[in-house]
């Protein structure tokens, strides 16, 4: 996928390939616990609730200016996150919107209060449900990144480097999380395999080299790139495995 349509967003990056970088990435994702069948049911329900709320927001924004402004500000927040490779603070968000922080806070509050009132809910409860959905979505993605790597390895030597394939497969995984319906009786790994494979094979077919990933994953990967760039700039040398391992808080010998 050359671009992500996810509601949590994505940011463009380029990998500098190499077995060392892949090894560090695998160490990092390997520390995430796998999900039980019960976990999948609970998390998928929260994700589906989140997706319904976001569809509802887009629909209501067509007729309610306060919600439309909230939606525009959220889209700006996402673009800024893509630019910064991390979710912006309220101050960074306000600067990007070119408005005072107080005005930003007021617009967000008014947007949520208007939205909540239209669906007979409470603003705090609405925001809590959205937060739960985002966290559930990220949890499902993080817990299945090892499956992405396993699938990507089957498609090596077809014109794209393994790390690029991993990124494309992650986008397929992201889509699977959005679509998964636990009531159909499938385990998520079975369901997501098709989406992961589709993301990878589509990328191979188009030979796409510019990849987009969810922000929470690019944050992790860009920490490595940042160390490489800082050491090259400040010390005039290439970052060692020890430097990168220290940044990721993993053992160099693991």
Cite the ranges covered by each PLM segment:
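Intrinsic, short, N-terminal disordered tails of RNA polymerase sigma-factor systems
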Residues: 1-3
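Short, contiguous pre-domain boundary segments
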Residues: 5-7
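Alpha-helical promoter-recognition and RNA polymerase-docking modules of transcription initiation factors
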Residues: 9-212, 216-230
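Alpha-helical residues within the helix-turn-helix
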Residues: 95, 242, 246
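Short, charged, surface-exposed loops that flank catalytic or proteolytic processing sites
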Residues: 233-240
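Short, intrinsically disordered, charge-balanced linker/junction segments flanking boundaries
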Residues: 245-254
